[in-house]
């Protein structure tokens, strides 16, 4: 199967995940940590719940991690690159959440909610990706079968 389905999977997952995060934040309206409570470098004016950074990292790197465990990628000639990438992706996801709390940009609950919403969105898109992959393979096998009969 061509790379277009994998590229569409990552692009749609990240793009729609960004929109979902914004919609949730506009409904919850939770304020960010204030300079009177914690040290904040630069107070931000927009809402804090859920952490968009944590959600985006979970969705983006999560989709790439998922693809890195699929058969076409595991049989890739440069498969030795996968383990360092997977470690990098997991560390990047975790350290982004830590940095958001450490800098006073988010409460811990905001970051955990960002991870959760990103994971739920990613899970839904993984199911859609698996369905689309099977659908494309069935159509391709029918088309090949019809061509061999002709």
Residue ranges, per PLM feature:
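A short alpha-helix capping/helix-coil boundary motif
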Residues: 1, 23-25, 81
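Short helix-capping/hinge motifs at transmembrane helix termini and TM-loop junctions
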Residues: 1, 28-29, 103-104
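Interfacial segments of alpha-helical transmembrane regions
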Residues: 1-19
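Short, hydrophobic secondary-structure boundary micro-motifs
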Residues: 7, 34-37
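Membrane-embedded catalytic cores of phosphoryl/pyrophosphoryl-handling enzymes
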Residues: 37-150
């Amino acid at each position: 199967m061509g790379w277009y389905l994998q590229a569409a999977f990552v692009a749609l997952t990240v793009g729609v995940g960004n929109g979902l995060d914004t919609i949730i934040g506009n409904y919850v309206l939770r304020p960010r940590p204030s300079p009177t409570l914690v040290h904040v470098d630069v107070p931000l004016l927009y809402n804090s719940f859920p952490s968009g950074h944590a959600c985006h990292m979970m969705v983006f790197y999560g989709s790439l991690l998922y693809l890195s465990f699929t058969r076409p990628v595991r049989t890739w000639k440069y498969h030795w690159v996968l383990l360092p990438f997977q470690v990098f992706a997991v560390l990047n996801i975790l350290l982004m959440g830590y940095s958001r709390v450490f800098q006073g940009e988010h409460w811990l609950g905001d970051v955990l909610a960002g991870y959760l919403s990103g994971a739920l969105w990613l899970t839904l898109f993984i199911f859609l990706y698996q369905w689309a992959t099977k659908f494309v393979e069935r159509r391709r096998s029918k088309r090949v079968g019809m061509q061999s009969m002709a």
